[in-house]
């Protein structure tokens, strides 16, 4: 299902200059996650979030996003953004990583002290990930 018609209207976002953001980025598939981070920062900057209110940490892969987000929640930020990309391969590894990551982030939302935004692509192909990280479906 295409999400192209559901792009965020950034004009509807309130001024966020007083909010502190923690961003946790997976280094795995960094050609995709770097573009997702760029899009995320563009939205934050366009809504008056100063660079000094943004902390970024990198983790090895999407599985480690949960740990990174937990650490970030402890840094007294207002919101955490988890950025990752899992691309399906030939084994069940994709399913295990996607399930563990999504459930872990859900648990942080239920039990943590601030929301964690799920910006993790779970695509069948590299082409799908490219299309969703600044490609034809935006960022």
PLM features: residue spans?
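Short, ordered loop/turn segments at secondary-structure junctions
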Residues: 28, 85-86, 121-125
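Active-site rim loops that border cofactor/substrate pockets in soluble metabolic enzymes
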Residues: 46-75
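Glycine-rich phosphate/diphosphate-binding loop of Rossmann-like nucleotide-binding domains
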Residues: 11-56
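Short coil/turn connectors at secondary-structure junctions
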Residues: 18-19, 75-78, 111-117
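Electropositive phosphate-/nucleotide-binding environments in soluble metabolic enzymes
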Residues: 30, 34, 38, 59-63, ...
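Glycine-rich phosphate-binding loop
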Residues: 64-105
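N-terminal presequence-like segments and the immediate start of the first folded domain
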Residues: 1-20, 136-139
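C-terminal binding/interaction regions
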Residues: 94-95, 99-139
């Amino acid at each position: 299902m295409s999400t192209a018609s559901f792009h965020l209207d950034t004009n509807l976002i309130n001024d966020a200059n007083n909010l502190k953001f923690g961003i946790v980025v997976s280094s795995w598939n960094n050609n995709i996650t770097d573009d997702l981070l760029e899009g995320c920062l563009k939205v934050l900057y366009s809504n008056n979030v100063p660079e000094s209110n943004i902390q970024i940490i990198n983790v090895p892969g999407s599985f480690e996003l949960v740990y990174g987000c937990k650490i970030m929640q402890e840094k007294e930020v207002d919101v955490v953004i988890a950025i990752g990309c899992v691309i399906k391969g030939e084994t069940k590894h994709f399913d295990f990583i996607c399930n563990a990551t999504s459930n872990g982030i859900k648990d942080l939302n239920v039990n943590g002290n601030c929301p964690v935004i799920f910006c993790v692509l779970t695509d069948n192909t590299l082409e799908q990930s490219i299309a969703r990280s600044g490609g034809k479906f935006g960022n």
